[in-house]
Amino acid sequence: MKKAIIIGAGPAGLTAAYQLLKETDIHPIIIEESEFIGGISRTAEYKGNRMDLGGHRFFSKNEQVNDIWKELMPLQGAPAKDDLMLGREKPLAEGGPDPEQTDEVTLIRTRVSRIFFLRKFFDYPISMKPETFINMGFVRTMKAGFGYLYSCVVKRKENSLEDFYINRFGRPLYSMFFEDYTEKLWGVHPSKIAPDWGAQRVKELSLGKVIADFLRHLFNPNYKTDSTSLIEQFMYPKQGPGQLWEKMASEIEKMGGEIYFGQKATAVLTENGQISGITCTRVTNGGSAQEKLTGEQTTYTGDYYFSTMPVKDLVLSMGDTVPAKVHDIAKELPSRDFITVGLLVNKLLIKNLTKMKTVNNIVPDCWIYIQERDVRIGRLQIFNNWSPYMPAHNEDTVWMGLEYFCSEGDDMWNMSSEDFIKFAISELVKIDIVKEEDVLDATHIRVKKAYPAYFGTYKDFDQVESYLSSFDNLFCLGRNGQHRYNNMDHSMLTAIEAVNAIKAGSTDKTAIWNVNTEKEYHEEKEA
């Protein structure tokens, strides 16, 4: 029986194993550096409170991806706890499981995300509501309007992410809502970032699109938007994203696949234009800031190799056989790391002034983009609104994730957990979101290489891609495996395309690398 060695137990690696088992006779072996399933899409747990590291909506325009999700965890057939408490109506799947009776169920949730700027809330994406103009004030509103009109007439050549945003929103709105947040996220100014990230993350969204959607809603209340960034509902596993990936891992093992933890790929062996093996070193606390190599090594050999490890690490682990130019480009590929603080509080200072009903009338947001320039926090997750089953006590506490973007080794990364938690709390107090005396508990998690970055040597990445594609039995998948800011569904699609190539006996990797770049993956989902 042929074997496939898969580096990484995140969405891409798991999907590769799952598809191989369902559609081929190839035996998959997954080697995972950490002790967790799901990669950055895992669900962390602290004293019964569950954390989604970054916020992961389950929505895809690809029906095969949607079918896999539903196959693993079917849609709810009865109301969730908070919907029952509030009398809210949600679409239900006929014959679907009851989330009050079973855990293996996917909920349908309402997407609410807003921007916190000037100590006020703005819809994200920016909407045409009167509140938007009131909060912006007359002068800012006029500047934004004229700036957008100017951007419609005078188009900039898109050499940077700054150009991309200005062309779609105008300079005043870009300065208000994109410039500072983007610099927080990447650590460099948008003028120094390639426009690719905007094309992949914002895609077809622009102020013109927002206006068009507003007018369609105005004259046709039943109109459904087709822009991914505007989708109003999404699927979400009852206990967070990691629950689904853990279910997939369980199914993989039931079908005969193998998963090994604490295995850090430290050497990729090559021979005659093929990958011939992966040497792993046993680690403790794999993937964390406290990671330690034990020295115990194991070499895994197979017929096919799937890599979801960071491209930089993959190339450097290939040794001196890599061309110098490719080595140098890969070595300097930038990425951003991530810190999240799980914060449990009695209540929030910010009030729910919307018409949306919530438990204890907390703000309805799943996540909030913090645009205030006097703090370093980037995003705030409110896990109660993702799923009422994420907090241990949804009825009387608010469980949040305070998200910071950083670089391994910088001042934030090197802070002790205790100091960082104090710092994060002080920032929420500063911008009037919580009172310090309302804090009940907190935890602190670091995540390495969460965001592949689009500056530095990224401009020459095609040379690295070409080199890696020259190995017929190597398939690079997922966010880190392709150095591309993919969503979960895109990561899954790279795995699906790779398995399709193997089934077809093809060594052409074009379709795999084109996921989330070609128009076919941006097509509107048909009704």
Report each predicted region and the residues it spans:
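N-terminal Rossmann-like FAD-binding beta1-loop-alpha1 element of flavoenzymes
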Residues: K2-I30
